[in-house]
Every structure is written in C-alpha cells, then in structure tokens.
Amino acid sequence: MKRQFALGAFLYLFLVSPSQGGEFDAARRKMVQDVLSDTAVTSSYSGSSALSPGVIAAMEKVERHRFVPADLATVAYLNRPLPIGYGQTISQPFIVALMTELMKVKAGDRVLEIGTGSGYQAVVLAEIAGAVYSIEIIEPLGKQAGDRLKSLGYRNVQTRVGDGYYGWPEAAPFDAIMVTAAASHVPPPLIKQLKPGGRMVIPLGSQFMVQYLMLVEKQQDGSVTNRQILPVRFVPLTGGH
C-alpha cells in the first residue's frame, strides 16, 4: 500500500507539479475530475450520478493545500485522505463532495458540522450555505482551524472547541448537519437540532468494523428515516456518546 501511494504521488507530482503549472490550479482541476469520476462510479450506491454545479464550483475554488501540513502541500490534491496531526485526517475530496451533495445545501442554509479538523470541509460548505457552525473536540486543531478560516476571510463560518455529540443548541435549528467522524449511533441531540425537512450525513460504525455513510432525513412530522449510502472509513467520534 505504501509503495502504491509513493508511485501515485510521484506520477501526480510529475504531471501536475505546481512548478510546472504555476500554483496548484492544474492539480486542483485534476482532483475535481477524479472526484467526478468517483461520483459516476459509485452512483448505484449513492444515488448521485453527478454533482450539482454549486458543489463542483466549491471544490474547484477551495484551495486544499492551505488545509494540510506544509510538508504535504505538494500532494494536497490527490484524491485521498491525508494526516493533519493528532490522529486526525482531512477527508478524501470525493467524500467531501459526496457528503456535501447528499445534504442538498442551498444558499442561505444554516449548516452544522461536527469535526472541524483542518477546516476544509467547513469552507466547502461555506461556499454554498449562508452560515456554517463547526465544532472540534481537539483543542489545538479547533484553534488552528479557526485562525485559518479567519485569515482566509470566511466570515460566514463560526467555530468552537467542544463536544460535537451535543451539537450547538443555541444556534439551532439547522437545515443540514454533517458529522465527519464515525459514531455508533445517530446522536439524539443532533436529531433534535435538525429542522423538519432537514438532512444529516453521518458515518456509522466502529473503528475496527465496517462503517457506512448514512443519510438521515427528518420529516415534517418529526419522524426520522435512514438510508445507507456506501461503505466508508472515518476516525471515531469522541465525546459524550
């Protein structure tokens, strides 16, 4: 697996090195094409054969290399997760796009994200939504992400350090909720904070067992439906649960 990664990284650098293309534009375009290809291949699982224009535009615009450690900037646009420290990762771009697509975020929506990480997913959401609220339980990561988002000028994202299992009740209700760590069950506080008609995307399963990305929809009468999307691998959700 390490050898395969090394070869892939070498080819990536050879084909889309910033020194050849000026900045990371070519690498980002290739990443988006890889994401679109994965979307088509997995359409029988996800129900999405294509991404909406808003999601594509966000993926094309947000500069992923600004959200990874400096020594990984040259491989930031590979379509795979990368470590960001503290045992955490920045999600695979395809998964970022798919989760965003599944939530059907619209302009003006209020979105809650559990697991800020580097802040990349929050920024992708912020390109579409009206307001994004993001919670990170690991204090150094949360502070770094908050500073990064401010420096990049994203004023429609609020971050805080805390236990995402309990959500952000004072900012609720939310049109959509995204959980970027695997839980054993859907946290009841998050269901409560989801608007009727809202959508939640969450990976369910333990760290050492099969995990599935789930789409949770809250009906107008308050009832909840779940749909299994596809197998995934996320770091575990920690905290109150």
Positions of PLM-derived features:
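Short linear Ser/Thr-Pro motifs
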Residues: 15-17, 91, 118, 134
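Bacterial N-terminal signal peptides that target proteins for export
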Residues: 1-7
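Generic anion/oxyanion-binding catalytic loop in active/binding sites
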Residues: 10, 88, 166
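Class I SAM-dependent transferase core
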Residues: 20-112, 128, 143, 151, ...
